[in-house]
C-alpha cells in the first residue's frame, strides 16, 4: 500500500473521530486519561496490528504525511475553538436558564438535545435574559489547554502511529508538539483580539438598544389604548422565546471560523434586544395599569363634573372604590323581608348623607344667581292660589313610588291643587343610585323613580315641580349645607317663603330628618302618617302660616263648594285607602308565595332550582305570579288542581290593573283571589308556619276593605241611585214606583257579594271543623291540641261533616251542569237554610241563581267544587282508618251509617 493511500485512510479515520457527537467525545477523553503516555504491551500490540493495515515504514512518505497532517490539525483547531466556546455557555450555570446542547448534521442544522442524564427533554419557560456584564471571556486559555490535552491523549497516538520504528514515531511526536505550541500562541493572540472586539461591540449595542428602548416607550405612550395592546401582543409572543434561544445557540455552535465575529455580534445584539424587550414590557404593563386607573378616574370626574374641588379628590376616589363593593343579599332577605330592606335603604341613605358621599359641588352652593320671575314667583303673588306642597324625599320615591303616583292625582279638599316637589339633591341621589354608585342593591328601585320624574316633567305636569339649580345654589337663613338632609330641609323652607299662603309638608321615612323639620317649623310626616292625614284634612285646617284671606271671605267662597269638596274628599280618601290595602297585600302575599315557590322548586329540582327558576330574586308579587305560571305544568300542576291556574291568572291581571289605576272592584277581586290561592295551598302544607300568618293578614285586609266599603260605598251608591232616579224621571215620569223600589234595595253587585260571602263562610266552617277532626283521629293525636275532647266525639263529627259535604257537592254539581235551571239551585238553598250556621240567610233561591249565573262567580264555584271533592276524599280515608276501631268499641250503627 502506498503512502498516499495510507494517508488518505488516516485522514478518513481522523475525520470520523472528530465528527462524533460531544457526549461520546467526553466519554472517550475519560478513558484516555486513564491510559499512560507510554503504551503497554497489550495496547502497543493492538495499535501495531491496526497500523499494519494502514501505514508503511517508508521515510519518503513521512514528509507527505506531515503536510496532510498539518491540514488535519487546522481542521482540528476549528473543533478545538468550538470546544473552547462550549464551556463558556456551560460555565454560566448560575444564570436563570440553561441552553440545550446541540449536535450537528451534515447539512449544518442544529439538533437540540437535553442536558439531563435521563434523556428527557426540557422546555425553556423563561425568557433568555443576557446582560452585557455577564459576557466574560476569561479562562479561555486554560479551557483551550484542557481541550488540547484531551486531544493529545494516547487515542491520537494509537490512530497515527506508523508501522515504522520508534525513531520515526519520536520525530513525528516532536513535530506534533511544535505544532501544538504554535497553535497555542496563535489562539492566545486571537482570543485577546476577540475579547477586545467583543467588549467594544457589547458597549455599542447596549447604547444602541437603550436608545431604541426609549424610542419604543415614547411611541407606546403616544398610541391609543386599543392599538397599543395589539402591538404589545404582536411584538412579544410566547413563541419568540424559542426563536431567540435558537438564534443564540446557532451563534455559539457555528463551525464557520470566518463568520465567528459576525455571529458573536448578532448574538450580543439579540441579547441586548431581549433585555430591552423585557424592560419595555415591564414599562408597558406599568403604563397600561397607570393609564387604566387614570381613565377610570377621568370618567368618574366627567360624569360628576360638578365636583371639581381639589381638596376632595382623594375623598372622591375612596367613595368611588367603596361604591363598587356592595354586598349581595340572600334570597330570603330579598324576597321576604321587604320592610327590613326599606329600613335598610333609609339607614344607608342617611349614613351616606351624613358622610357627605353625595355632596353637591362647593362652587355651585356659593354662586350668586339672580332669579328670574318664573311661574313659582308669579303664582306666589296670587292670594287666591292655595296649594298643598309636599316635598318628597328619596326614600319615599324608592320605597313607595306607587303611593307617590296616586298622591299626584289626589284632590285634597281646601286646596286649589296638590303639588309634589322634588329637591335638587334628591335627583342627584337618584342619579347615583341608578348607576349603582351609592346603594347598589337599590338600583332596581331608583330607575323607576327616575322614569316617573322624567315622564312628569316631560309632559309638563303641573302637579310635580323640581327644585331648580338656582334655588339649590342659594343660601337660606345662613345654612351651610353640611349634608343632604339640610339641603332637603332648605328646600322646604324656601317654598314656605316663596308661597306663604300654601301649606308645606315634608314626606320622608328618615326619622331624624323629620325631627329636624319639626324643629325648623316644617310639618314632617312619614308615608303612613301622610296617608292618614290626607283623609282628615278639611276646610277648617289652617292653610296659611299667616292668613292671607279674611275668614268671612273664606267662608263665603267655601260655602257653595262644600259638595264638590266632599266628593273630592271621598274619591281621594278611597284611592289612598285602596292603595294602602294593595301595598299591604303585595307584601303579605309576596311573603307567602315566595315561601311556596322556593319550597316546591327545591322539592322538584333539588339544588338546581335556582338555575331553572324563571325569574331570579329579588321578586315582586308580579314576578312571583309569573314564576307560578311558567312552572305550573312541571311543578305546581302535579300537586295542585289545574283550575287553580285560573286564579293565578286572574290575580296577575288584576294586579297589573291596580298598578296603573286602583279602583274598588279591582281591589276586591285581588283580596278574594289571594285568599282562595292561599287556602288551596294550605291543604298541602303550612310551609314552615308562613302560610297561616299570610292567610291571617289577608283576612285582616278583607275586614279593612269591608269597613271602607261600609263607610264610602253607601254615599256613592246613594249618588248613583239618585242619578238613576233623575234619568228615569225624565224619560218615564209616569212610572215613579220603579225608582222607589230600586232605591230600597242594594245594587245588584253588592247583593251578589253578600251571597258569595255566605258560601265562603260555609267553606271556612267545614275546613276548620275537619282540621280539628283530623288532629284528634290522627296517629299523633296525643302530641297535637284539638278542640274536640274525645275520640268518639271526633268520630261523630266526622260523619256529620261527610254528610254536609255530600249535600253541598250535590247542589253545586247540579248548578254547574250544562242545562241547569232555576230549580237546580233549590238543593243548595235548602242546605243553607237547614244548618244553624246560616240562620242569617235573607235571600231567595232566585237571587242565588242570578249570582251563580255570572261568569265570575261560576268560575269560583267550579274551583270550590274541586276543593270539596278533595275534602270528601280525605274524610273518607280518615273514616276508613278508624272504622274498625269504632266497630270494636260497639258504637251505634246509626252513627256508622253516615259513612255510606
Swiss-Prot record:
Protein name in UniProt: Transcriptional protein SWT1
InterPro entries per UniProt: PIN-like_dom_sf, PIN_dom, SWT1_Regulator
Region (Disordered): 1-54
Xref: SMART domains: PINc
The organism of origin for this protein: Homo sapiens
Top-level taxon: Eukaryota
Composition-biased stretches (Low complexity): 38-48
Gene that specifies this protein: SWT1
PANTHER family, alphabetized: TRANSCRIPTIONAL PROTEIN SWT1 (PTHR16161:SF0)
GO cellular component terms listed in the entry, alphabetical order: nucleus
Family designation: Belongs to the SWT1 family.
UniProt tissue specificity: Expressed weakly in testis.
Domain PINc: 388-515
Transmembrane regions: none
Comp. bias (Basic and acidic residues): 1-18, 26-35
